[in-house]
């Protein structure tokens, strides 16, 4: 196989977040509104914009070597691909999306078994059919082209299976979550033949490592300071860190340099304590990656 990796960027709600994640990871991806072929500053890669709903199929067929899609759509299509890693990010938050069974707020539905013989509207038809079939609950599942919440409000169906992060839109429409059917996060998937190719596998693993390290660094900062030798133990005891703080001697001095990594929101608590304990020259700096 040639040393060129064909990669799928998810088009739609994940598009901007994915491009930004690649940027933080060291790749510049440029997307034109009139093209489905983004540019990327990597001579070993080409990119295509593909709907997440179709990504698994194209990866399975080797139209592309690898791509990013929601685990929900990989499951929906039952795509025979390699799941390289999962990455928790979305267009609005850093939490997983949930596919939930939803009914009217005033309905008597308490669980899936109460919907025997009912009509359910959803975009995730295949998964929903399998879910109810595995539980021997007969239902009629209809594909929804959108505005799915309105269908159950208007009485066009008895319940819906819809994706949500916060549940706020569901509540705003007077609906109620009956139960969660599946949790989904973006996953990096690879074609099996591409994964078996040593060069392509190494390239895909490189991408996975850097994307995950950028996500791990979000909302984390580094803190560096100088401290007198007799205060080091007290100072390091108040420092949260991924591992023990790094301590090194300053040249020609009995002072030491201390460095630590922590959550950004912890800094406001830690810095005043450090000052009280005698730390000086405190520097906070952003992190791009944590590996």
Curated annotation (Swiss-Prot):
The keyword Membrane does not apply. GO terms for molecular function: ATP binding; ATP phosphoribosyltransferase activity; magnesium ion binding. Its cofactor is Mg(2+). Its EC number is 2.4.2.17. It holds the Pfam family HisG_C. SUPFAM superfamilies: GlnB-like (SSF54913), Periplasmic binding protein-like II (SSF53850). GO terms for biological process: L-histidine biosynthetic process. GO terms for cellular component: cytoplasm. Its main location: cytoplasm. Feedback inhibited by histidine. It comes from the Bacteria. Pathway: Amino-acid biosynthesis; L-histidine biosynthesis; L-histidine from 5-phospho-alpha-D-ribose 1-diphosphate: step 1/9. It catalyses: 1-(5-phospho-beta-D-ribosyl)-ATP + diphosphate = 5-phospho-alpha-D-ribose 1-diphosphate + ATP. Transmembrane segments: none annotated. It is found in: Cytoplasm. Keywords: Amino-acid biosynthesis, ATP-binding, Cytoplasm, Glycosyltransferase, Histidine biosynthesis, Magnesium, Metal-binding, Nucleotide-binding, Transferase. Belongs to the ATP phosphoribosyltransferase family. Long subfamily. Catalyzes the condensation of ATP and 5-phosphoribose 1-diphosphate to form N'-(5'-phosphoribosyl)-ATP (PR-ATP). Has a crucial role in the pathway because the rate of histidine biosynthesis seems to be controlled primarily by regulation of HisG enzymatic activity. NCBIfam families: hisG, HisG_C-term. This is ATP phosphoribosyltransferase. It comes from Pelobacter propionicus (strain DSM 2379 / NBRC 103807 / OttBd1).
